């Protein structure tokens, strides 16, 4: 027992409170921002002729990201170009990747945007690493749902 008047004697255990609406609002805002970022990336890749674009929802499987975006390119030059286009288009909005790996070899470029990780492969490297198989428990999403339809760009 705590002596009367001590701080511990005045503390009452409260039942767990329901999360404040502002927390729910923040989570919704974050979800929308992450989805918008994924849409921007997939739209850019599609616009610049990336092949076999896949979006895998991995948030329930890992804390690394919410989405993996995987795409193929026809050559190392195409891989670098796709990486440049994505970085440039998101950069216009002040969004920079946390890191980019593999750019110098351009066999596989990884672009880490926090909640969205982009994997750009040459076809052979994609077949070899087979990330779709490694992350098969993730939810495969319809790529068409991530492509923004715009007017004449």
Q: Where in the sequence are the language-model features?
A:
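Short hydrophobic/aromatic beta-strand micro-patches
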Residues: 70-72
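Short, residue-level hotspots on alpha-helical faces of the histone-fold
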Residues: 85-88, 115
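Active-site phosphate-binding and catalytic loops of NTP-dependent enzymes
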Residues: 92-100
């Amino acid at each position: 027992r705590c002596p009367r008047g001590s701080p511990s004697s005045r503390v009452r255990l409260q039942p767990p409170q329901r999360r404040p609406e502002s927390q729910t609002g923040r989570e919704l805002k974050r979800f929308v921002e992450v989805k918008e970022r994924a849409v921007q990336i997939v739209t850019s890749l599609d616009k610049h002729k990336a092949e076999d674009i896949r979006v895998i929802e991995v948030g329930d499987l890992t804390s690394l990201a919410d989405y993996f975006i995987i795409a193929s390119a026809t050559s190392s030059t195409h891989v670098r170009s796709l990486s440049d286009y994505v970085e440039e288009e998101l950069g216009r909005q002040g969004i920079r990747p946390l890191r980019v790996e593999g750019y110098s070899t351009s066999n596989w470029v990884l672009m880490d945007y926090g909640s969205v990780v982009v994997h750009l492969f040459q076809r052979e490297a994609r077949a070899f690493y087979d990330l779709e198989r490694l992350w098969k428990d993730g939810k495969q999403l319809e790529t068409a749902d991530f492509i923004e339809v715009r007017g004449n760009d």
